[in-house]
Amino acid sequence: MSSSSKNKLVEEIKKDLFSGDDVVVMKAVLKCKDQDSVTLVEPLIAVYASTGMPEIRREVADLLNNIKVPNAEQAFLKALANKQNAKVRKDILSFIWNSGIQPTEHIVDLTEIAIDGSFEEALECLTIIENIDDQVPEEKILESVSVLRSAISSQPNDPKTGLLADLLSVLESRTEEF
């Protein structure tokens, strides 16, 4: 398939994802399985966040949990930063972990989400960071450790403090790699 016809198909899928007709949306979601376009990640997350249809949510979650396209990490991180996705941020973090993405350059962002987010979001961030196999830049780890220490000391009674302490321990153990 030529690049222009592939782009046209992706644009058609995007249009159908937001058609408002559940049957058309489901067909568009199913078409996404045959595409390896990173430009579909954010629209799929938007559909996931906005649909009331459990079947559509399940299909989208399955796609995003198993996504293997170049630059998916950037699309997920952009979606995490989008305030419109606040109610599904835990799910986006889960998609990152399930898809095997190694966000080594974004450890600080994940640490800040763990601190500022819900308990469930903090747990997802811990899981992602614990399972990173790739080398993480030392300065990112040191910055995350500093931010976590500050958060833990300033919020000792926060229900997430134990979880944040676990994250701190994971990050500190990674400093031994240097």
What kind of region is each of these model predictions?
Residues 50, 116, 131-134, 150, ...:
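General structural signal for alpha-helix termini and helix-helix connectors
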Residues 1-4, 23-35, 46, 57-69, ...:
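Structural detector for internal amphipathic alpha-helices that build alpha-solenoid repeat scaffolds
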Residues 142-151, 159-165:
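Preference for long, well-ordered alpha-helical segments
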